[in-house]
Amino acid sequence: MSDREQRDGGRSAENNNDRKGRNNGRRNDRRNHQDNERDKYIERVVTINRVAKTVKGGRNMSFTALVVVGDGQGMVGVGYGKAKEVPAAIQKGAEEARKNFFRVPMIAGTITHPVEGRDAAGIVMMKPAAPGTGVIAGGAARPVLECAGVQDILSKSLGSDNALNVVRATVDGLKQLVRPEEVAARRGKSLEEVAPAQMLRKRAGQEA
């Protein structure tokens, strides 16, 4: 025990231990909070690629990960991570995806109207579908729709098969979706004049 600790009866050591305990407790709380936040979301890794950068001393190898994250209830985001290890690249992609969250308008588990998304050479067509149809989508478009919580949809990729282009085209299409109330307000009409009767019945059944 140091002279200072002897003079104050060992209180300094006790205070230090208490301080360390509080700091460890805060770190554990933050870690648990992050784990809980992660558990709330659906996470899908679309692609992982290895890339090489040629430098003076040779080649620097790294990995890229295209990640989709959503809550399954209308929120979804896409992120692109790059790191020297695969887990780190996936983590960076997931963090970026959470920053890019946006809401997808849906009625009874399907999108509100037909839409076509484009990005570079990627073209994705999406149409509403009847209950029980399921997610009719292939390739990189399916993870985006599933993470968003879309249950019934008809979609088709009409352009490039590149995963990044397809994902971005799907996101572009979903961002074009508008709620019937917005269309009615824009046109100065009632909801019944704008939205099909079948859609209104679906919404009434969903809210009941």
UniProtKB/Swiss-Prot annotation:
The keyword rRNA-binding is assigned to this record: yes
Pfam family, one: Ribosomal_S5_C
Entry keywords, A to Z: Ribonucleoprotein, Ribosomal protein, RNA-binding, rRNA-binding
Residues in S5 DRBM domain copies: 41-104
Record GO terms (molecular function): rRNA binding; structural constituent of ribosome
Cross-referenced PROSITE patterns: RIBOSOMAL_S5, S5_DSRBD
Superkingdom, taxonomy of origin: Bacteria
Biased composition annotated in UniProt, kind: Basic and acidic residues: 1-21
GO BP term, pick one: translation
Assigned GO CC terms: small ribosomal subunit
InterPro entries: Ribosomal_Su5_D2-typ_SF, Ribosomal_uS5, Ribosomal_uS5_bac-type, Ribosomal_uS5_C, Ribosomal_uS5_N, Ribosomal_uS5_N_CS, Ribsml_uS5_D2-typ_fold_subgr
Region feature Disordered, mapped onto this chain: 1-38
Record-linked HAMAP family: Ribosomal_uS5_B
Family note: Belongs to the universal ribosomal protein uS5 family.
PANTHER family: MITOCHONDRIAL RIBOSOMAL PROTEIN S5 (PTHR48277:SF1)
Quaternary context: Part of the 30S ribosomal subunit. Contacts proteins S4 and S8.
Record text about domains: The N-terminal domain interacts with the head of the 30S subunit; the C-terminal domain interacts with the body and contacts protein S4. The interaction surface between S4 and S5 is involved in control of translational fidelity.
Function: With S4 and S12 plays an important role in translational accuracy. Located at the back of the 30S subunit body where it stabilizes the conformation of the head with respect to the body.
This protein's name: Small ribosomal subunit protein uS5
Source species: Corynebacterium aurimucosum (strain ATCC 700975 / DSM 44827 / CIP 107346 / CN-1)
